[in-house]
Amino acid sequence: MTYEGAIGIDLGTTYSCVGVWQNERVEIIANDQGNRTTPSYVAFTDSERLIGDAAKNQVAMNPRNTVFDAKRLIGRKFSDPVVQSDMKHWPFKVITKGDDKPVIQVQFRGETKTFNPEEVSSMVLSKMKEIAESYLGKQVKKAVVTVPAYFNDSQRQATKDAGTIAGLEVLRIINEPTAAAIAYGLDKVEDGKERNVLIFDLGGGTFDVTLLTIDGGIFEVKATNGDTHLGGEDFDNRLVAHFTDEFKRKNKGKDLSTNLRALRRLRTACERAKRTLSSAAQATIEIDALFDNVDFQATITRARFEELCGELFRGTLQPVERVLQDAKMDKRAVHDVVLVGGSTRIPKVMQLVSDFFRGKELKKSIQPDEAVAYGAAVQAFILTGGKSKQTEGLLLLDVTPLTLGIETAGGVMTSLIKRNTTIPTKKSQIFSTYADNQPGVHIQVFEGERAMTKDCHLLGTFELSGIPPPPRGVPQIEVTFDLDANGILNVSAEEKGTGKRNQIVLTNDKGRLSRAEIERMVREAAKYEAEDKDQVRQIDAKNGLENYAFSMKNAVNDPNVAGKIEEADKKTITSAVEEALEWLNNNQEASKEEYEHRQKELENLCTPIMTNMYQGMAGAGMPGGMPGGMPGGMPGGMPGGMPGGMPGGMPGGMPGGMPGGMPGGANPSSSSGPEVEEVD
């Protein structure tokens, strides 16, 4: 059954979050671990693929094949200095296949595999989709996905492609601070006052500042700015570098940066220390056998942390100043400053922002980790035709973060759409040829704020050919830029004299995936999902056999049944159970069918003996007998599972007898699934 509405997904650098409009409000949906945010991590092992908490929990044991930060790669070129710098901090391998597109290389099921950043992001999106589906009990097909306001066209396109690979129709790409503004302003729609609101959004990997006016239900963005590469991870990097140096100093030059596992354990401890410093004046790091069997203990004060990250913290104020300049607004005219993103919990960041606005009290009424997904869910509800008094008349007027234009003679950037123009928008301009008898024109589309195109970002190129060769300056070529509500650009050009027309096809020279590549990735995503389901079924079958074996073992050793079961029967069951458990230990990777076959064999042997025993006990006047003949029925085999008692039957024990089910039930460690030991 398909869900008619759409979900809102905040696809974060370090954590992601999903929400849906239900019963006149937004529900932020918890994952299977009960957490309302899910790590944007994907891990590949010899036997399975893990996404979210499961992936992050095993990262220290498997650093090379655990991928995170895909958002810092998406829509970027391999040669980008930012990518080259990040690669020094990542334990996984990033390569290029010669087309300047970064791909991530991992070992998966014994093979070397490569994944595009879009594919990794699509895996995180499919996990968020799955979280929503288990909550709604329906299949989800549509979503609104958020991106940093300062994401460029390539990064937006790539995020949309990731949604397609995950099997989602992305109804809209919206800017994260704009989504947060909806979360903040939704309950203020009816007060009728015009408010100037500044959203300060500092997350795990990106930073955005957006200034908007909320007037009734109209959310009009005035200006936006930011840094697509600044966030909590950069603060973690400073801490990691600091403690790596300290370890070297304390341990005769031992360099732990050569050991990926040690580095990962240190990074996890640094992340924890950073969070502690938001509420305490100092934090202690303790890691056993960190490197070369040397234990590491160190303390860091909040003041030292603020010094290490001082320039990064202060750097957040420059986009705030630029936004106010672009909007031609004085800081005193800002009514509310709203903090969004986990990194705004850092006291120094709060102090800097408050001081900048002359001691203004910062608004913390919205949950910083969930505000973006909340706003995306509201927009998803509106875009699928949802009607509610709260969202009635809600109108979002967003802007483009970067100037868009084409290259003209001499490498000059001639802009058609200026930054902070409200979208959607369409602009046209007439150009002509530069040389006599020019049969065609080569149109190059750029985005950026610099005067020369060499300092701007190339989005794509296309040709308009077949122009009659007149003298220079005669042909009238109309170039049209059409920027949609997602902030994604379409460009067309027409020669007025001949009616010759062409438009840009965003191909691989722009770093975007081709249609064929997207289709291949969609097929592969479906294949991986099917393999994941097979893996779960195999584990269920294995646990089913183990649970059944332990239940039988506990049943025949139960003091309540002593003397009620023949010694020979007890020996038969005990011996069969021991044999099954030994086989299990030696066959951890057997198929689902093999586990089921083994369980069936064990059931066929145990069921008649156990049935006779219980009938004998019932005949002896066991209080209440066995109601309903053991629900789920024993004949035909007790269906797999038996968590905490006999499967499909005798839930909670036979009334009036054998309280609590068969004592011991299933072995605790097997009934509750594998235990996860936390790695420092």
UniProtKB/Swiss-Prot annotation:
Biased composition (Gly residues): 643-664
Keywords: ATP-binding, Nucleotide-binding, Stress response
Residue spans crossing the bilayer: none
Coiled coil: none
UniProt GO MF annotations: ATP binding; ATP-dependent protein folding chaperone
Region (Disordered) location: 643-680
Classification via Pfam families: HSP70 (PF00012)
Domain of life: Eukaryota
Family named by the database record: Belongs to the heat shock protein 70 family.
UniProt name for this protein: Heat shock 70 kDa protein
Source organism per UniProt: Trypanosoma cruzi
Gene from which this protein is expressed: HSP70
